[in-house]
Amino acid sequence: MTQEQANQSETKPAFDFKPFAPGYAEDPFPAIERLREATPIFYWDEGRSWVLTRYHDVSAVFRDERFAVSREEWESSAEYSSAIPELSDMKKYGLFGLPPEDHARVRKLVNPSFTSRAIDLLRAEIQRTVDQLLDARSGQEEFDVVRDYAEGIPMRAISALLKVPAECDEKFRRFGSATARALGVGLVPRVDEETKTLVASVTEGLALLHGVLDERRRNPLENDVLTMLLQAEADGSRLSTKELVALVGAIIAAGTDTTIYLIAFAVLNLLRSPEALELVKAEPGLMRNALDEVLRFDNILRIGTVRFARQDLEYCGASIKKGEMVFLLIPSALRDGTVFSRPDVFDVRRDTSASLAYGRGPHVCPGVSLARLEAEIAVGTIFRRFPEMKLKETPVFGYHPAFRNIESLNVILKPSKAG
C-alpha cells in the first residue's frame, strides 16, 4: 500500500461489505441491516466507491444535482469505456451516459410511448404470450418459473411495443441479458461472465437492431415507437443515429432481466407467504401493490444504482471527491425502519408510495408501466391457472453484476379442475 492509499484508508470509514460472497444473493438483508444500523455511508475499497445505506440519504441523492448519472463523470470512466468496446456507444449515448440537457431532450421523445395508456394497449399481447407459455406446460407436474415461463415474457412485450417480428425475440432476449451483464464489466469488482460470450450476443443484437431500424426507415408504420423516433431524428436532428441505437438498445436491455426477476421474486414471495397469497387471490386488485411490495421487501438488485460526484462535497459526514462513485444501496434503503413500519414484514396492503424501487426524479425508470403490466398479468395468471402451486425446492441463485439472479425456481403444479 502506498502512503497516499494509506492516508485515504484512514479518512474513509470502511466496513465489511461483500455483495458477491456466497449466500449474499439468497439473503443480503442481515448483512445490509448491520451496515445500515452502523453508518449512513462507508467506503467500499473493493468496489472503489462510497455506499449509502439509509432511505432519506439515498432518496435525496436522486434529486441532488451535485451527483451525476453519467459514467463520463466517473474518475475511472476511461477504463470503464474501454471495457467491452462493442458497447462504447451505448455507454456514451444511452440515457445513463447523456448529459442532463441531452437526457431531457431524449426522455421527452420517449415518454409518450411509455404512458400507462400507451402500455395498456399491449395487455392482450402479453396475456396471449402468458397463456401460450402456460398451455405448453400445463401437463407437467413440475415447472421452472424462470426458464419455462418468466424468460419468455418480457421480450415478446418489448417486441410488441416496437412492432418487431416474433422471430427476433430470442436474439433480442440474449442481447438484452448480455448487455445488462456487460454494462457491469468495469463497474463492479467481480465479473464471472465469459466476455467472449457476452460480446457475441451484444454484437448479434446490435446488428439485428441496425437491420430493424433500417427496415423501419424504408417502411414507416403508424402509431409506432420506432417510426416516431426515426422521424424525430430525420426532421429535427434531435436524435443522432448513435443515440437512437443506444436508446432502443437500452429499452431492450433494461426491460429484459428486470422483468424476469420481478416475476420470479413475486412468485417466490407469494408462495412463501400463504396469507398474502390468499389476499391477492381474493382481491386481484391488490396484485399491483403486491408487486411493489415485493420490490420493497425483497428487492432484486444486488447492490443498487450509482451516481458520480460532480464536485468535491460533504455528504453524511463523508468527504467525497469529484469523480468518485457512490452506490445507493437500494435494498437497504427499502428496509429502513424510520420510513417503513415493520420493514421486515411482507405486507401486500402496505402503502408503497415511498418506494425507491424505480428511482426518483428525472431518471425514474421510463419502463415502469410496462414492467408492472407484464408482472401483473404473468403472476396473476399463473396463480389463477395453478392455484395449488407449491415450491418444490429453494431457488437457485447465480452470478449477475447487477441483480440477485434467480436462475431456477422449481415449483410443483396442481392445476385446478377448471384448468
Swiss-Prot record:
Protein residues bound to substrate: 180, 304
Known cofactor(s): heme
Swiss-Prot/TrEMBL catalytic activity: epothilone C + 2 reduced [2Fe-2S]-[ferredoxin] + O2 + 2 H(+) = epothilone A + 2 oxidized [2Fe-2S]-[ferredoxin] + H2O; epothilone D + 2 reduced [2Fe-2S]-[ferredoxin] + O2 + 2 H(+) = epothilone B + 2 oxidized [2Fe-2S]-[ferredoxin] + H2O
InterPro entries, A to Z: Cyt_P450, Cyt_P450_B, Cyt_P450_sf
Pathway assigned in UniProt: Secondary metabolite biosynthesis; epothilone biosynthesis
Entry binding sites for heme: 365
Enzyme Commission number, as recorded: 1.14.15.-
Disulfide partners: none
Swiss-Prot/TrEMBL keywords: Heme, Iron, Metal-binding, Monooxygenase, Oxidoreductase
Family: Belongs to the cytochrome P450 family.
This protein's name: Epothilone C/D epoxidase
Species for this entry: Sorangium cellulosum
Record lineage: Bacteria, Pseudomonadati, Myxococcota, Polyangia, Polyangiales
Gene name, Swiss-Prot/TrEMBL: cyp167A1
